[in-house]
């Protein structure tokens, strides 16, 4: 990918990977989140330490043939009734099954596409499905066990803010804007994701740390 000043997708993919600590698990939902990072890993050799999965592809029966390519996965979810719609119970159960079966296998953390969750389902301090907290983490949410954030909300907020600083540094000249790219393009979508990442830090997942 071209990393020139106009290469918004390259920057987006690099920023997504940079937010994942060594050995982490990255779960993509949107094409925008999946393809730039996948290209960098597959074609440019970036971040071979990261396990990267698409929640759009995971439910397909044929994907079972790909399991050996991801040896660090401890347990694969039951995808018989899975959905790819984040607003549905079946999709949330898919994500939860991945987290439940693999949180111990990835001590560096599990990171979910920022747009891979239905925002109205996220409660105070990022509580989600009663068992988890979703912590804003740049272009992702970090999935952590329930109670972890409540115990030290200020520390988790500091981590969220540090990831925003990292994201801002990646987009040194600012995110793609309609002045340079066509509305509806992937570059503009990348700019929207950049702005959403900033907004999420001030929303429910960290609001309790500020009160």
Locations of regions flagged by a protein language model:
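C-terminal luminal/periplasmic domains and tails of membrane-associated envelope-modifying transferases
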Residues: 3, 14-25, 29-38, 44-211
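Active-site cores of enzymes that catalyze phosphoryl transfer or operate on phosphate-rich substrates
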Residues: 1-11
């Amino acid at each position: 990918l071209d990393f020139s000043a106009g290469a918004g997708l390259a920057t987006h993919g690099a920023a997504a990977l940079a937010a994942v600590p060594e050995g982490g698990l990255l779960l993509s939902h949107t094409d925008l989140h999946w393809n730039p990072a996948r290209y960098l890993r597959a074609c440019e050799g970036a971040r071979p330490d990261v396990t990267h999965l698409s929640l759009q592809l995971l439910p397909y029966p044929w994907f079972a043939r790909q399991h050996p390519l991801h040896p660090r996965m401890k347990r694969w979810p039951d995808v018989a009734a899975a959905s790819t719609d984040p607003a549905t119970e079946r999709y949330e159960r898919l994500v939860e099954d991945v987290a439940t079966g693999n949180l111990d296998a990835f001590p560096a953390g599990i990171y979910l596409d920022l747009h891979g969750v239905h925002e109205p389902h996220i409660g105070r301090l990022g509580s989600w499905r009663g068992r988890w907290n979703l912590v804003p983490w740049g272009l992702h949410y970090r999935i952590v066990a329930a109670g972890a954030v409540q115990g030290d909300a200020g520390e988790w907020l500091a981590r969220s803010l540090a990831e925003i600083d990292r994201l801002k540094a990646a987009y040194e000249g600012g995110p793609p804007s309609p002045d340079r790219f066509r509305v509806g393009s992937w570059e503009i979508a990348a700019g929207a994701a950049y702005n959403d990442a900033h907004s999420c830090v001030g929303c429910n997942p960290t609001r309790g740390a500020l009160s």
